[in-house]
């Protein structure tokens, strides 16, 4: 673990000025998901500073796993947009993390800050497989439970909105629709023409409330010009902006995944993770 941190994290530390552990986690997020990337710095999570822990969380939310890029591309999203967004997410996530939670402590990544013995190796292949399966199952159960709870909560909120909207002739009222209206100014600020801002804001809202996969799925017909906006196909400029904006795990469900994943790796930091 130590030599990997010195090799990869050290390079990013010099370029970005961040600690080696958070830099390595950000780099790993380019290739793997938000629950797998923190595993490369797992021995250090429990002793990370609040700023480092927040940077790890931001990196996971800002990026997507490399394994899902093909799925998004099959919906019609240009692969060059997805790859560019993934690589931009690593330094971008660290940048915003440090703006929101600046480092006020002294990060440490030596053996005294690690949770357990870094040199503790499995006795053989069977021991390694058993330990990996046990850790993986614990992580999956925690993530699954948190994800189920958050999705259920969102469904309950949408049910309430739909019922209230039905009283006023708007049974289609939902959290996603409200966020679409709410995020239309944001869509306009990032370059989407106002005539397309409400539609773009709706996709951003879907990404935030549900997940980016559902948002891309609903965005696909616009990419193929199967759905028109006021009788006109969505502009290529807007398609590119939305493709970048949706490429990330930042949504309410991912908060549950982070809480379950990082919480199982460092139970003593669960409160800090939830507050972040």
For each predicted feature, which ranges?
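Alpha-helical transmembrane segments
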Residues: 81-96, 240-248
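Long, contiguous bundles of hydrophobic transmembrane helices that form the permeation core
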Residues: 87-139
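Hydrophobic core segments of alpha-helical transmembrane domains in multi-pass membrane transport
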Residues: 62-71, 86-101, 146-159, 183-186, ...
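Loop-to-transmembrane-helix entry motif
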Residues: 15, 48-51, 132, 136-147, ...
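Alpha-helical membrane-protein architecture signal
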Residues: 23-24, 118, 122, 126-130, ...
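Alpha-helical membrane segments and immediately flanking helix-loop junctions
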Residues: 13-74, 200-276
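Hydrophobic alpha-helical hairpins/lids featuring a short glycine-rich hinge
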Residues: 1-18
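Transmembrane helical segments that form the transport core of multi-pass membrane transport proteins
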Residues: 134-231
């Amino acid at each position: 673990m130590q030599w990997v941190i010195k090799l990869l994290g050290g390079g990013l530390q010099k370029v970005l000025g961040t600690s080696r552990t958070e830099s390595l986690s950000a780099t790993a997020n380019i290739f793997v998901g938000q629950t797998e990337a923190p595993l490369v710095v797992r021995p250090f999570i429990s002793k990370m500073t609040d700023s480092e822990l927040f940077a790890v969380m931001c990196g996971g939310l800002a990026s997507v796993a490399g394994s899902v890029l093909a799925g998004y591309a099959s919906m019609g999203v240009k692969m060059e947009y997805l790859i560019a967004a993934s690589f931009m997410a690593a330094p971008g996530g660290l940048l915003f993390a440090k703006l929101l939670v600046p480092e006020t402590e002294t990060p440490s990544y030596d053996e005294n800050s690690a949770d357990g013995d870094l040199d503790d190796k499995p006795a053989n292949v069977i021991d390694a497989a058993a330990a990996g399966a046990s850790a993986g199952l614990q992580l999956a159960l925690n993530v699954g439970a948190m994800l189920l709870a958050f999705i259920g909560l969102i469904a309950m909120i949408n049910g309430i909105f739909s019922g209230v909207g039905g009283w006023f002739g708007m049974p289609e009222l939902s959290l996603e629709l409200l966020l679409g209206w709410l995020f239309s100014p944001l869509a306009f600020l990032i370059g989407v023409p106002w005539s397309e801002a409400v539609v773009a804001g709706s996709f951003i809202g879907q990404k935030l409330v549900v997940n980016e996969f559902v948002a891309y799925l609903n965005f696909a017909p616009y990419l193929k010009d199967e759905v028109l906006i006021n009788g006109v196909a969505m502009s290529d400029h807007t398609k590119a902006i939305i493709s970048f904006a949706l490429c990330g795990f930042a949504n309410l469900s991912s908060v549950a995944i982070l809480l379950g994943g990082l919480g199982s790796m460092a139970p003593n930091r669960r409160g800090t993770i939830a507050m972040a």
